[in-house]
Each structure stands twice: as structure tokens, then as C-alpha cells.
């Protein structure tokens, strides 16, 4: 779509609760979520390998990091609440938010081991995408270190299209970062949304919790 004469820029995403079946995204609150998040990541230093920050050494350091996120008005940070036990087990941001162009990104996705590879983890991405497109955004971005193979596979599984590689894009923790770019645009979202919803349906899982149809196959991707 090239003619945008009637298009209006969406608002900056308000910090609000996003409710799902398996998870709930709550605006990050250090007092409310800090202790649970720090506990969930205890001993999980490898999670931070490709993130721009180093793994916090203790609860106080973790809460200071979370506080810096809350105070950053350029992002929309969420705690990921696992509704199985109503505990915060991760966090992510809406970031690189450019209302004038209708662009937003989900990033700094930080899932603790108990949250990884769960329906709640997948639903969190669905909720962020549905929120942004529901506000009127046109483009949903995913970017990652090109060395981060799990993140690249996840992007394809979720239905993001690979767009290319920004070589020597950043210096992170004293190392070169080539950045892989992925996106979903508004015209693609209805099909991606339907795939997410079909995969997340309880009918897609057997009595042992095993998926019947993969999200990758629903999106036509091989993760």
C-alpha cells in the first residue's frame, strides 16, 4: 500500500494490561514483579548471552535494571505473568516505537527457563502483535544478533519474514553484532493472528500437552 493520504499515525502504546489465556502482560512494576523475576532467573546467566545487558548478579542489581526500564519513556516494558501460578517469569518490551511511521518492535525478550518453550511464551508475542496492530501500527519488527540461532528460528515460527542482514550494525559487550531483521506487516497480520489463535487453542494439544499442529506449519515456515 503506497497511498497513505487517509492514514493517521497511531498513538504511542499506553502501558496497560494485556490479558491472554496462558499469560498476562502487565506494565512492568519493580515493587510488584522484581522479586519474582529475579528468583525466576537465578542461575540462568546464559539467557543474557545475546542481550545488550549483562546478567544481574543479585536481586538488587536486577531490580535496578528493571527500574531503568520502567523509567524509560521510549519503550513499553511488560512483565510476563504465567497464569498457571500467577508468577512473573520474564519480561519484554515494545520498543523502537515510531508512531509517525506506524512501526513497533518486540524486543529485549527475556524468558526464564520455566517460561521458555511454553504456550504462555508464545502467547506473549501474539499479545504484543495484536496490541500494536489493534492501535493502528503498520509494521511489527523483530531483530536479533545474527549469531542467535534460537531467536532467528523463533522469528520464523511466529510468522515474521526475514528481510536481510545489517552487517557490523552494532558493538555489543565488546563484540561485533550483525543484526538479522524480520517483520510482519499489517496486511499479513490477519493470517498470522489466525495461526497464533489456532495453535494456542486447547484443541491443538493432547492430554499430555503435546501440540498436534506446529505453529511453523500453520505459518508456512520451517523453524
Identify the meaning behind each predicted range.
Residues 1-118, 131, 135, 175-180, ...:
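GNAT-family acyltransferases
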Residues 121:
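Glycine-rich acyl-CoA binding loop
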Residues 128:
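Flexible ATP-lid and adjacent glycine-rich G1/G2 motifs of the Bergerat
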Residues 133-144:
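Conserved GNAT acetyl-CoA-binding A-motif
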Residues 142-152:
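Conserved beta-strand-loop-alpha-helix junction that forms the acyl-donor binding cleft
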Residues 154-155, 182:
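Conserved active-site tyrosine of GNAT-family acetyltransferases
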Residues 161-175:
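Conserved catalytic-core motifs of GNAT/GCN5-like acyltransferases
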Amino acid at each position: 500500500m503506497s497511498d497513505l493520504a487517509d492514514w493517521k499515525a497511531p498513538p504511542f502504546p499506553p502501558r496497560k494490561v494485556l490479558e491472554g489465556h496462558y499469560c498476562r502482560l502487565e506494565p512492568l512494576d519493580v515493587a510488584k514483579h522484581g522479586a519474582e523475576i529475579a528468583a525466576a532467573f537465578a542461575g540462568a546467566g546464559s539467557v543474557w548471552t545475546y542481550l545488550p545487558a549483562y546478567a544481574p548478579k543479585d536481586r538488587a542489581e536486577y531490580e535496578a535494571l528493571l527500574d531503568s526500564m520502567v523509567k524509560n519513556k521510549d519503550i513499553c516494558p511488560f512483565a510476563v505473568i504465567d497464569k498457571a501460578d500467577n508468577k512473573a517469569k520474564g519480561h519484554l518490551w515494545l520498543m523502537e516505537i515510531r508512531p509517525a511511521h506506524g512501526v513497533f518492535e518486540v524486543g529485549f525478550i527475556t524468558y526464564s527457563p520455566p517460561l521458555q518453550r511454553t504456550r504462555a511464551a508464545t502467547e506473549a508475542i501474539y499479545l504484543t502483535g495484536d496490541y500494536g496492530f489493534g492501535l493502528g501500527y503498520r509494521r511489527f519488527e523483530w531483530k536479533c544478533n545474527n549469531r542467535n540461532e534460537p531467536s532467528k528460528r523463533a522469528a520464523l515460527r511466529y510468522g515474521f519474514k526475514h528481510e536481510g542482514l545489517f552487517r557490523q550494525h552494532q558493538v555489543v559487550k565488546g563484540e561485533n553484532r550483525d543484526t538479522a531483521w524480520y517483520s510482519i506487516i499489517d496486511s499479513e497480520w490477519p493470517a498470522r493472528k489466525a495461526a497464533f489463535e489456532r495453535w494456542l487453542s486447547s484443541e491443538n494439544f493432547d492430554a499430555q500437552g503435546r501440540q498436534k499442529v506446529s505453529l511453523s506449519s500453520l505459518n508456512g515456515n520451517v523453524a
